[in-house]
Amino acid sequence: MTSGADLGRDGVRGALALGRREMLVWLAVALLCQQLFAVPAASLEAYLGELQSHLASKSIFTYVAWVAVFSLIADSARQAPARTSDVVLLLAVIASGVLTARSVPWLAMTASAAYFMVRDRTDIKLSAAGAVMLALALNGFWGPRLFEFFAYYLLQADAALVGAALSATHTGVQWSETIIGASNEHSIIVYGPCSSFHNISLGLLCWVALTKLARPRWVKADIFVGLAVVATVIALNASRLYLMALGAESFEYWHVGTGQQIFAWATTLSVLVISLYGALRVGRTS
């Protein structure tokens, strides 16, 4: 007879017989399923509806980042054998799928990113994949938690930037903490979803993903590209808030009307152009 322990050892040996690259691809698949397809629902029909809404709510930058993760893992060392720690991490990620806490998938992502970046420093492709995974975790989980902690100050900073611009171009400006307006007749309150911080973390996700896709090694000039992404997102967001504070009609247009779409596309294209320039040009000249 074969004991459970023997079966367990045979299973581990069988997993170790796989190439390390294949093992880590399966790890990425498990993480992807947790992030995109683990949607609670009471029935299959409800699940499909919730899944469609969930996938549609994700930014294009999220999907670009996942393409980068799988591409970098696929380009990693071909002949390296799987390690016991790889199997343990994969099994831990799969087992974490039974937990219902929303933070669990992000903690699994963070742990996997750290594993790639620390354990695989000699394989620059896997280290780069870890950087993209960390950017995903920062955008989806750690960034919002950080924002909650510093929300008061970050929202005041956004309001101060817009208030200063209004004061320089209009008279009779109303400005108190996070309340700003061009006149007594109209004011807006800067809430969390309007903050530049959310778009900054998304812009940095695009920058990291495209940079790592183009070249796995960082160069010194990359920091300036990242800062350019941050500055552009802040400038565009402040411009939108400025226009929303001018009057009721302007608010409707830029908050829920066509202006909202213009802002979204302008931000997306600007971040893409800057990130692509940094990925394709900066690396050649540094």
Can you say where each PLM-predicted feature lies in the sequence?
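Hydrophobic N-terminal alpha-helices or hydrophobic patches in metabolic proteins across all domains
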Residues: 2-286
